[in-house]
């Protein structure tokens, strides 16, 4: 099963731009989305090696398949989420 894991921070301006794009793409493609604020819950971010925000990770069957870091246009987010 595929899911998208999204790491952000309250202070992160690019995160605020990316979150609506990620939410829209995951809803459109019916992909589960998990959102983590690294300010409040950094354990998973550390475990997954997240060092920049925003970081979006595509996980399939518990294995990281790909990650996207930083600000990206809508079409790239769509492609990232919809890829199999």
Model segments located where?
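Short alpha-helical
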Residues: 13, 40-43, 75
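Thiol-based oxidoreductase modules, predominantly thioredoxin-like and allied folds used
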Residues: 6-7, 26, 30-43
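Conserved strand-loop elements at the edges of beta-sheets that form or border functional pockets
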Residues: 38, 50, 70
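A structural signal for the main folded, soluble domain(s) of proteins
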Residues: 23, 27, 31, 61-64
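Structural micro-motif
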Residues: 48-57
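Local sequence-structure signature of Cys/Sec-based thiol-disulfide redox active-site neighborhoods
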Residues: 1-25
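Non-catalytic, surface beta->alpha helical segment in thiol-disulfide oxidoreductase systems
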Residues: 58-84
């Amino acid at each position: 099963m595929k899911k998208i894991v999204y790491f952000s921070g309250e202070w992160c301006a690019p995160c605020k731009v990316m979150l609506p794009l990620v939410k829209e793409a995951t809803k459109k493609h019916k992909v589960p989305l998990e959102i983590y604020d690294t300010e409040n819950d950094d354990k998973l971010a550390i475990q997954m090696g997240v060092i920049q925000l925003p970081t979006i990770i595509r996980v399939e069957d518990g294995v990281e398949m790909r990650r996207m870091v930083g600000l990206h246009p809508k079409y790239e987010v769509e492609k990232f989420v919809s890829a199999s």
